[in-house]
Amino acid sequence: MNPQLHNIILPIYMDYQATTPLDPRVMEAMLPYFTTKFGNPHSRSHSFGWEAENAVEEARSRVAKLIGADAKEIIFTSGATESNNLAIKGIAKFYGNKKNHIITVVSEHKCVLDACRHLEQEGIKITYLPINPNGIIDLEILKESITNQTMLVSVMAVNNEIGVIQPLKEIGKICRERGVFLHSDIAQGFGKIPINVNEFNIDLASISGHKIYGPKGVGALYVRKKPRIRVTPLINGGGQERGMRSGTLPTPLIVGLGMAAEIAYNEMEKDNKHVSYLFDRFLNNIKQKISEVYLNGDKDQRYKGNLNLSFAGVEGESIILAIKDLAVSSGSACTSASLEPSYVLRSMGIGEELAHTSIRFGIGKFTTEQEIDYAVDLICSKIDKLRELSPLWEMMQQGIDLKKIKWASH
């Protein structure tokens, strides 16, 4: 496994769900707005301001085009965490005197769940929908959960840990029929899978720049204008962004997000073919070489840039240490500092012992076939060695049911 023979540079980046490298074309588009084109886009009295404003509006149109929205429906924010908070808390504050119920899903991103918990403390009722063992929600349970007090349903497009795609079109149809707003955290799906806010009846959608080869520190919230959706702002000030998000806009970052959206619009199909091919190559080769490897989440209804695998009989943390040539994660980058097993995997009904063995491998547009082959060889050789040392693996081979063992301490 000589990296020179594979013509690759170590470590290999395989954590594309946590963040993505900046596309060089995005960097090129941003640079002038850090140097000569430094105007404030809200300065209306001179050419420096007009130039910056034009750049911001072009970026707004590019972001809107990627999801079939109108440019006026795009509100720039600092990222998807802010967008999720603005959508959920903003709707609750504006409509909370008429309705008091929100529905979300147990496997949502931490910032959605935490925003909902915050609202619970303020008296809003929250329903957390369960997920099936494949990671996807049951539409019948959603229908049954909607009441005449429900103001919002919040369901993500693509899960950040397991990559499954929720049936947003069907969810949107249900919400529209019942007169309930639909918010979706589309950070992991924006620019990667086709999303059309009108076709899917999405009313609010959260976007992140750094998940699509754009800069960190910038994102957007799509807020439908027809019929008009109102949100109470989190930040008050000069009334920028239709009064929903005050503060001077960071022109270079917004230009970067716009350029990243434009590239994704033109190259999504090509990127998806590349990523799908590498996904199949990676998964098939690993499964041929080692046994007891499980793909977490639905195999077909998923974004193929995300492979969450469980390797029976080996701890996830020990795998990460063993394959240090690969930059990977044992869960969401926001929660992987905790040694608790993934709440997403647990909510799918995966047992603690398998949840502890999971690793998330991210494949992106810059990943090469050589890197995938090197990764497969490295993983398989290290898993074999770790299993030789693992008493759990030995017990499994002897047919002992690990669930029935009573451990002295944990």
UniProtKB/Swiss-Prot annotation:
Specify which residues bind pyridoxal 5'-phosphate according to the UniProt entry for this protein.
80-81, 160, 188, 208-210, 248
Q: Indicate where this protein is primarily found.
A: cytoplasm
Task: Name the enzyme's class.
Answer: transferase
- Indicate where this protein resides in the cell: Cytoplasm
Q: Where is the active site?
A: 334 (cysteine persulfide intermediate)
Q: What is the catalytic activity of this protein?
A: (sulfur carrier)-H + L-cysteine = (sulfur carrier)-SH + L-alanine
Q: What EC number(s) would the UniProt record show?
A: 2.8.1.7
Q: Which GO terms describe its cellular component?
A: L-cysteine desulfurase complex
Q: Which residues cross the membrane?
A: none
Q: Which keywords does this chain's UniProt record carry?
A: 2Fe-2S, Cytoplasm, Iron, Iron-sulfur, Metal-binding, Pyridoxal phosphate, Transferase
Looking up Pfam families in the UniProt record yields: Aminotran_5 (PF00266)
> Cross-referenced PANTHER family, in alphabetical order?
CYSTEINE DESULFURASE, CYSTEINE DESULFURYLASE FAMILY MEMBER
Assembly mode: Homodimer. Forms a heterotetramer with IscU, interacts with other sulfur acceptors.
Supply the name of the protein: Cysteine desulfurase IscS
Q: What is the source species?
A: Rickettsia canadensis (strain McKiel)
Q: What taxonomic lineage is listed for the species of origin?
A: Bacteria, Pseudomonadati, Pseudomonadota, Alphaproteobacteria, Rickettsiales
